[in-house]
């Protein structure tokens, strides 16, 4: 019987697959292929679904790859989305995403992809490794979540997680989980959150339930990997969110062990707002021919963000903070509108007779809509001691405050952040734990109470506001000691430095670095109030003392500013404009008020030329304190000699610099290839400005070269430029790369950011054959711990163990011995579980219950029903309890359909009958046994 002709009907997605079913365009079995024609396998297309654990069959793989490619092309058609307006030129519809994912994206509120999403999503869909950098608030989370959901598609019944997202902080991981759930609607993908502070037993149950996506922090994920002996060979999609923070020294031990267990054929993605151009610092990530996408390298921060920097003294920081909150932001005191509304609802619920159970109130609190107020402000402090102190101080001032720091309990952290998100509080005081990735809608202001020591920390802090096209403000308190860091930030951003009112009205807070002081009257009133509160409140004064001690340790361990900025900051701080009124208050103060402020500032900075001993000696004419006078004279003589030598050195250096600059300018003018820097920005030094030229995205040079800002090297480069042929000359330093920017973006910042300095400190220790000491300088293995008053091992400082016992992991790196505590084995015994399924095997249905309960949030709901207690006639509320018991009985009767409680069924099944027959037979044999008595 001949085969019927091919059906002309199109397939469901409007494309015909008969071309793949029949070779040589034959539509039926009647046509015989020619003898010369050979069977050509279809062109293999990279699979869009990460299901590599299936049966290995080449023909099936080819068919699946072809169908996946056709499905992707069909998804790109505008006709696939009926009744929707399709934007031309690179919308989400043109990326080949499925209909369910497009609906979730539209439900999320995304209409047009952001630049980072438009650049990275197609590359990720082509199974390439990506290193992506874009400014804060540009949609980097959706840039890697959308292709992950498209690749995973649906839940796999085979054991093994396929996606892994690592985040440096718990709040960022929680936020990523929320985005994954919102974009994963319409799919049955299962995702879990593994962060520190949560119950290990619950996380054991979730991991045993075979999740598809794991969102975790490195420490807790490594703990579960070692404790449960997890096999990570099934993971095909790895994301390092905020990669520059993850690859710093704090996470070195965790990442080494985690990366060792990941398969080599995985797809690796690195995302952050501050990534260096040199990828050598991420060599441990195992990138394979990555695509580097660096956007917004010139802007770095949002153009909608306006910045203000206030010069204050150390004793005025608390008063300055209160003045900014009260007068600049206009922060209201007392409870917020949301909290008042909540109290009214609670009061009405108490008056309601048939009020619901507390569980319903808890659900209502959890499901509250995130609606921060227009006054929502984040205050960044240096240490957790500062956070506690500022929380108490601002609460004393009447503000609604929340606080978060690293060592806070995880449940408390969730509650505090949720209160701020829902508008229960207006102020969130945090350390840098919340500086990365936290996306709080309608956040209006950011205050840097302690100025950051690195420019990239400043970028992440102020990036919490002015997100997704909204406006925002950042206010920073700058002391005299913080001025070098301010100049480093100004050079990094490449913006003009405006000190005081030197430029008059021509100030742009979004494009300039504008500094100045706060109005003296309001600042002095706030400082007086703080002093009064500290005198009246002993607990607050004790917290301030602890914060001062913590600040000493923080100042000792923070990174140092550049030498050029330190020299330049002395001139900036000593100028009169440093203490002048900030241009932000130009409308409020007249010129006469500005002169008054200058006079008060000069009086405040007055230093008497004589000491009290010299003044008394000159007035009284007596020589009572001869020893003190002699000591002061010797000190004064020494200081004067040092000052003269310093002035002479500065004069000689100035003359040398002027001559070197003149020579370099003359020789550089002869060379046409050397580009001259624009003179529009007088605040940026010429040498630094030459190094701040932006590089193109396609360049991927990896450089270890060190750069010196000394005048001698500049003169040598300028003199050598005469014989350099630009067509053949290859410099050992990059010409177009901004070294200032790369140093600020560096992962190992501080002293180890320079390769030359790091190479000097690198040593190779060889032990002698006889075990004796060598001739070289022996390295001290112990150091003195000032806090604990004892010697501790230096190795503990390097690996972060701080004296805890260490064991060797699979990669050879040292990990904490507490990771192998045996709690997982105890959990299995407690739940009566035997051997768990391995990677590649089918999942066990009884193990998925824990994961499903965790996803639905029903872990803590009890189902037990008990009869109410009998009312006690001797109690005063006897009638009330009696009515309550009667209502409970009526509710139980109505629940059972009005009938009496059903008894146990007496019908026997086959097993019961079989067991009963066996017992009856045993009794019969026992009764028929003859008696032993004779």
UniProtKB/Swiss-Prot annotation:
Domain Helicase ATP-binding residues, every copy: 121-293
Top-level taxon of the source organism: Eukaryota
Gene Ontology MF annotations: ATP binding; ATP hydrolysis activity; RNA binding; RNA helicase activity
Compositional bias segments (type: Polar residues): 21-35
Short sequence motif Q motif: positions: 90-118
Protein name: ATP-dependent RNA helicase dbp10
Renumbered ranges of motif DEAD box: 241-244
Keywords, comma-separated and alphabetical: ATP-binding, Helicase, Hydrolase, Nucleotide-binding, Nucleus, Ribosome biogenesis, RNA-binding, rRNA processing
Sequence similarity: Belongs to the DEAD box helicase family. DDX54/DBP10 subfamily.
Compositionally biased intervals (Basic and acidic residues): 639-654, 865-893, 903-915
PANTHER family registered for this protein in UniProt: ATP-DEPENDENT RNA HELICASE RHLE-RELATED, RNA HELICASE
One Gene Ontology biological process: rRNA processing
Location in the cell: Nucleus, Nucleolus
């Amino acid at each position: 019987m001949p085969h019927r002709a091919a059906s002309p009907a199109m397939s469901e997605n409007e494309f015909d697959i008969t071309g793949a079913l029949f070779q040589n365009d034959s539509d039926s079995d009647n046509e015989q292929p020619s003898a010369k024609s050979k069977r050509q396998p279809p062109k293999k297309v990279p699979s869009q679904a990460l299901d590599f654990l299936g049966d290995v069959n080449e023909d099936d793989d080819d068919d699946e790859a072809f169908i996946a490619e056709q499905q992707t092309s069909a998804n790109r058609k505008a006709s696939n989305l009926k009744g929707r307006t399709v934007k031309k030129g690179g919308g989400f519809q043109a990326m080949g995403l499925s209909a369910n994912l497009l609906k979730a994206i539209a439900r999320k509120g995304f209409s047009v992809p952001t630049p980072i999403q438009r650049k990275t999503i197609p590359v990720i869909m082509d199974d390439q490794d990506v290193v992506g950098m874009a400014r804060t608030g540009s949609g980097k989370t959706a840039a890697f979540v959308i292709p992950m959901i498209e690749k995973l598609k649906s839940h796999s019944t085979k054991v093994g997680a396929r996606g892994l997202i690592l985040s440096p902080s718990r709040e960022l991981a929680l936020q990523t989980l929320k985005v994954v759930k919102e974009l994963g609607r319409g799919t049955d993908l299962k995702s879990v959150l593994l962060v520190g502070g949560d119950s290990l037993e619950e996380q054991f149950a979730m991991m045993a339930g075979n999740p598809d996506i794991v969102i975790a922090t490195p420490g807790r994920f490594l703990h579960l990997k070692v404790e449960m002996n997890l096999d990570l060979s099934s993971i095909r999609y790895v994301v390092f969110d905020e990669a520059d923070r993850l690859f710093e020294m704090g996470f070195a031990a965790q990442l080494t062990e985690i990366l060792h267990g990941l398969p080599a054929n995985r797809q690796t993605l690195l995302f952050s707002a501050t990534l260096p151009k040199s990828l050598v610092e991420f060599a441990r990530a195992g990138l394979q021919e990555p695509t580097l996408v660096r956007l917004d390298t010139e802007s770095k921060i949002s153009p909608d963000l306006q910045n203000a920097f206030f010069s204050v003294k150390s004793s005025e920081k608390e008063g300055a903070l209160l003045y900014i909150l009260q007068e600049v932001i206009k922060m209201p005191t007392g409870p917020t509108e949301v909290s008042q509304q909540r109290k009214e609802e609670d009061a009405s619920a108490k008056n309601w007779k048939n009020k619901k159970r507390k569980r319903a109130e808890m659900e209502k609190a959890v499901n509250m809509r995130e609606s921060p107020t227009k006054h929502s402000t984040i205050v960044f402090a240096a240490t957790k001691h500062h956070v506690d102190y500022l929380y108490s101080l601002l609460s004393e001032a009447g503000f609604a405050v929340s606080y978060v720091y690293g060592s806070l309990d995880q449940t408390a952290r969730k509650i505090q952040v949720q209160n701020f998100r829902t508008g229960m509080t207006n102020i969130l005081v945090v350390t840098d734990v919340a500086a990365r990735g936290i996306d709080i809608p309608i956040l209006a202001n950011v205050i840097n109470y302690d100025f950051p020591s690195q420019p990239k920390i400043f970028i992440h802090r102020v990036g919490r506001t002015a997100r997704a096209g909204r406006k925002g403000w950042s206010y920073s308190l700058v002391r005299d000691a913080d001025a070098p860091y301010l100049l480093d930030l100004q050079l990094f951003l490449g913006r003009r430095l405006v000190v005081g009112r030197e430029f008059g009205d021509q100030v742009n807070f979004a494009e300039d670095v504008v500094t100045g002081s706060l109005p003296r009257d309001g600042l002095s009133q706030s400082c007086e109030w703080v002093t009064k509160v500290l005198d009246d409140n002993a607990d607050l004064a004790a917290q301030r003392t602890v914060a001062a001690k913590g600040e000493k340790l923080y100042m000792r361990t923070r990174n140092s500013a550049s030498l050029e900025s330190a020299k330049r900051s002395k001139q900036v701080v000593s100028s009169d404009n440093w203490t002048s009124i900030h241009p932000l208050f130009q409308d409020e103060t007249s010129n006469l008020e500005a002169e008054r402020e200058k006079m008060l500032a000069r009086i405040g900075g007055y230093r008497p030329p004589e000491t009290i001993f010299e003044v008394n000696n000159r007035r009284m004419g007596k020589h009572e304190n001869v020893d003190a006078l002699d000591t002061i004279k010797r000190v004064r003589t020494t200081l004067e000699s040092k000052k003269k030598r310093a002035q002479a050195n500065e004069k000689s250096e100035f003359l040398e610099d002027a001559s070197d600059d003149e020579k370099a300018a003359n020789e550089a003018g002869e060379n046409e290839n050397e580009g001259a820097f624009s003179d529009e920005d007088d605040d940026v030094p010429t040498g630094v400005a030459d190094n701040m030229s932006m590089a193109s995205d396609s360049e991927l040079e990896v450089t270890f070269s060190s750069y010196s800002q000394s005048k001698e090297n500049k003169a040598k480069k300028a003199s050598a430029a005469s014989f350099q042929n630009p067509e053949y000359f290859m410099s050992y330093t990059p010409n177009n790369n901004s070294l200032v920017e790369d140093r600020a973006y560096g992962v190992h910042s501080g002293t180890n950011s320079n390769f030359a300095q790091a190479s000097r400190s690198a040593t190779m220790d060889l032990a002698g054959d006889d075990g004796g000491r060598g001739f070289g300088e022996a390295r001290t293995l112990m150091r003195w711990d000032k806090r604990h008053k004892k010697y501790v091992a230096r190795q503990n400082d390097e690996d972060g163990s701080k004296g805890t016992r260490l064991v060797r992991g699979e990669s050879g790196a040292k990990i904490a011995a507490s990771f192998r505590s045996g709690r997982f084995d105890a959990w299995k015994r407690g739940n009566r579980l035997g051997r768990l399924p391995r990677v590649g095997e089918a999942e066990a249905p009884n193990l998925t219950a824990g994961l499903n309960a965790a996803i639905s949030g029903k872990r803590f709901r009890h189902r037990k029903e008990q009869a109410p207690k009998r009312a006690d006639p001797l109690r005063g509320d006897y009638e009330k309890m009696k009515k309550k018991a009667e209502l409970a009985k009526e509710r139980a009767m109505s629940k059972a359909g009005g009938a009496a409680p059903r008894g146990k069924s007496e019908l026997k099944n086959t097993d019961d009958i079989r067991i009963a027959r066996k017992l009856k037979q045993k009794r019969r044999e026992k009764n028929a046994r003859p008696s032993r008595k004779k």
